[in-house]
Structures are given as structure tokens and as C-alpha cells.
Amino acid sequence: ETLKAELRENPDTYIWGQDMANGEKGVIFNVSKGMQQEFGPERVFNAPIAEDFIVGTANGLSRFKKEIRVVVEGAEFADYFWPAMEQLVECSHDYWRSNGAFAPNVTIRLASGGYIGGGLYHSQNIEGTLTTFPGIRVVSPAFADDAAGLLRTSMRSEGPTLYLEPKACYNA
């Protein structure tokens, strides 16, 4: 519901990623279910399975004007985000080097951690690596109750934010 509320609040908010606009699916954990029907294909749309392309395009789109916010389903699982690291570094460098003057207002959502019996490639925690990049916020709700406020703050902030969603919170 937080994603929908933020899209209603700011008409310059876009969300895109893998399986975002596939009917009633709403990505792997149904977080964006029904959003394309409400906000249209101009604001909620699919991306190819190419994590570097997803993040790089979000970075470029967010530069068009300061009010634009882009929420990215960066990879269906954090484990698959590694190909996007070069583009993430570009987001962080631009923000850091310009002291915030060039702010890619991008929130990258990643499902992180275990608890689904997914094995090696569906259960990794990558936040230790992500926190080493200057100019990027890395946040993760500890409890389901924290998720809405933290996501809202991430989406309204200037500069790039990685929002890591613990899989254990999805059904809490």
C-alpha cells in the first residue's frame, strides 16, 4: 500500500522492474499487484531481465527533473543484483562527487535473506558489500511494522537508496 500511496502523492513517481506489469502477479512476492491497472503503463512497467540495464535506465530517467522518483525492482532476489553493481557505482559516484547536486532519486527494492527454502541463489544477504559504496543509503526494515515508513522515507529522499526487504517480513 505504501508504493500506491506514494504514486498517488507524486505524479512524477515511476516504478519498473521484472514482472511489474504482468497482469495480477505484481513481481515475485505480489508487492506491486494491480499497480499497472491503477496507474497505467506509463508509470508502472516491465523491464527486461538485465539488472544493469534496469538500474542504469532508472538513473537516467531520474535526472530529467528533480521531482522524479524511480522505484526499481532491481532484481527479484538480491542474489541476482550483482550484474547491476557497475550502474549502482555510477549512481553513488554522481551523488557523492557532486555533493548531492546530481541526485539520482532512485529507490532500489531487493528481496534479501533466507526463510523461503530457496537455496544458495535465493537466500543471500548482500548488504555488507552494498554498505561500502559512498553516497548510497542502504536500509532494511527489522519488522513488518517498520517497512511502510522506511519505504516512504526512501522514496522521498534525494539520492540513491537500496531498500532491502527481508523475505521473512513478507508474510508477517
Question: Where in the sequence are the language-model features?
Answer:
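Thiamine diphosphate
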Residues: 1-171
